[in-house]
Amino acid sequence: MPKQRLRALATVPRSEAERPPAGSPSVSVVITNYNYARFLPDAVTSALTQSDVDVEVIVVDDLSADDSQQVIAELAASDPRVRPILREVNGGPVAAFNDGVEAAAGRYLVRLDADDLLTPGSLARSVALAELFPAVGLVYGNPVHFHGDVPQQARIRPTGFTVWAGHDWLTLRCALAVNCITSPEVLMRTSVLRAVGGMRPLHHAHDFELWMRLARASDVGHVDGADQAWHREHDASLSATQVDVLRDLNERADAFELLFTDGQGSPADDADLLRLASAALANEAITRTTQAYVAGRGATPETDAYLEFARRLHPDLATLPRGRVLATVQRLGPQAARRSPSLFVGAVRTRVGAQRRTARRQRTGL
């Protein structure tokens, strides 16, 4: 497994990262909404109260069936910076966001779901980084996930900024084949976003594909040590609507396929990155297969589906990092694999390694 480290193009110390951007640069916050009237006021307020930037809030309602449009009208009447877009046809979150992008006037743009919020000073921190580095088209930081009441505290003092070459960041994402960004913590340079195009019609991986497309066209910045957004987890949220593992694998594969066959990048480089991502996804699928064998679920429709997926992306499974373990569990069979001490220890190490990678991602953004 590749190391989760990148050589930074540039770093900025705390003393400079804490300086607000000069001249109040303009930011468009595009809030997409469907039946979230109860959350809208908090989301809009979190954007309107941002300091050191000139904010416009574009609320795109996707033909909600609740009282969202009334709430939006009241919010717009109370502050001229709120611009409603009321869709006449329900088109889903991708179409709603793209409508907001088309209407945006800001130098920078943030996509905010109606149930999420920006932390105090979030936009100023991200904009400060982007203003220092004109080649950066994507800035992100740490999102805080919460249930219930909105948190009252957040880390608002950055410890620094880190900038990576977009191609290096993208290569690591392909090597790991995992999305490291939630969404509300992202700030995009509007000119770069419009150059690469808006979101594409993927079910759950539309944001992941967009982040990678931006990285293919620009450098990537990270606000270190600060919380950039609050992401609400609740039963109705899109992110909380559980996607089964196999569907998630397929949708990530679709995102890589769509990105690297769109003709917008270098053909040779895109082909290499697609092979890298496909191998990583296939390796993840056979890892889940071996873990299932150790848990007593080997040689089942579940593992058959994982292996079918893996072979579709990378036919020679023996060449993958987990290929030897796969051969071992298949040779032993479900019962013997479940009783194997060495396989059990290996499964524990695999799980601990995944937990460490998650913790590292939360700390470094990678």
In which residue ranges do the predicted regions lie?
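C-terminal subregions of glycosyltransferases and related glycan-biosynthesis enzymes
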Residues: 1-22, 175, 233-366
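Cell-envelope/extracellular polymer assembly enzymes that use nucleotide-activated donors
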Residues: 25-28, 56, 209
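A conserved acidic beta->alpha catalytic loop
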Residues: 61-70, 89, 113
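Flexible acidic/His/Gly-enriched loops in nucleotide-sugar-dependent glycosyltransferase catalytic domains
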Residues: 123-192, 196, 260
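Short, acidic, metal-binding catalytic loop of nucleotide-sugar glycosyltransferases
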Residues: 45-54
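Short aromatic/hydrophobic "clamp" motif used to bind/position activated sugar donors
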Residues: 109
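Glycine-rich, basic loop-to-helix element that forms the pyrophosphate-binding segment
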Residues: 87-104
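Conserved nucleotide-sugar donor-binding catalytic segment
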Residues: 161-252
